[in-house]
Amino acid sequence: MAGKTKKAPAVKIPESEQGSDAQRNLDPRGKRSPDSPILVVIPYLAREAQGRELEYAVAGWRRHFKEEHHIVIVGDHHKVVDTGDDITFIECPRIDDVPGQYMPHLDHVHKFRKVREAYPDVKGFIYACDDMYAVNDFTMIEVLFPKKDREIIGDRNSANGWHRDQWKTKEMCLKERLPIDNWVCHLPVYYEWDKLFEIYDKYDCEHESYVVENLYFNTYYKNRVPVQLSLLHDNLKCGVYRAHPDMSIVREAFVNKIWISNGVTGWIPELDNMLKNYYFGSR
């Protein structure tokens, strides 16, 4: 008579390694509960817009994000906020400049606090930029998937505030004995409010500008091995960051990537026309 097969003992995963609430609430179909609809928060500063970026970004979320969600534009008003019940505007003027600090990082702390005040019962949100354009379908699985870009290269003496913050953040990670992976991929990321505010408070992010994504993910995901992004091999992003990119690669991205994004230099007429035709046809 065959003996009974013993079940393997349950493995208790420490809470610190269980991942985010969003990950724990995902089922195999990418559906999420109970924190639904998912907030998609896009900070917007009108004076830095170069064209219709925000319209394209919103159109991408509406067409391709296959989850119940609600878009929040925080910052300056844009006509796109009046185009449906699935989008809300929170007015939040840019804070005054602080000498020696990189203002977008300080300003985002201010803006995200405003969003938290408006949605106190929501556990977290997706942070996205107005220059990230979804061109193929995705769910929370792709947003939560651990990914990194090239190693942080910063310069404490740079005239560029972003480069100074990269250096300062890397030094802080080393001081705290954290990994120095660069999680800033110019792709949407999911933050849990409580954990994000712990980072804000610990590092005084309202007054000291840091690359918060790297403090956050190197703290709470320090035992993860994120995938290195590669234009040739991943299906996630095509970044347009030069004035004269290979447009054949950009055209292919509408088929083989989930997002297209751009920098200031990469906002060129060819890209603008491609996105306009993709989302709105001849309009």
What are these regions (language model features)?
Residues I13, G19-R52:
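N-proximal low-complexity "stem/linker" segments adjacent to membrane-targeting elements
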Residues V81-P120:
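Active-site-proximal specificity loops/subdomain of glycosyltransferases
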Residues D165-I258:
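Catalytic core and acceptor-binding pocket of nucleotide-sugar-dependent glycosyltransferases
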Residues E68-H78:
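Short beta-strand/loop segment that forms part of the nucleotide-sugar
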Residues K123-Y133:
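Short beta-strand-to-loop acidic/aromatic patch adjacent to the donor-nucleotide binding site
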Residues V240-R283:
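Long, low-complexity C-terminal extensions of enzymes
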Residues N136-R164:
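Conserved donor-nucleotide/metal-binding helix-loop-beta segment in metal-dependent transferases, i.e.
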Residues G60-E68:
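Short, acidic, metal-binding catalytic loop of nucleotide-sugar glycosyltransferases
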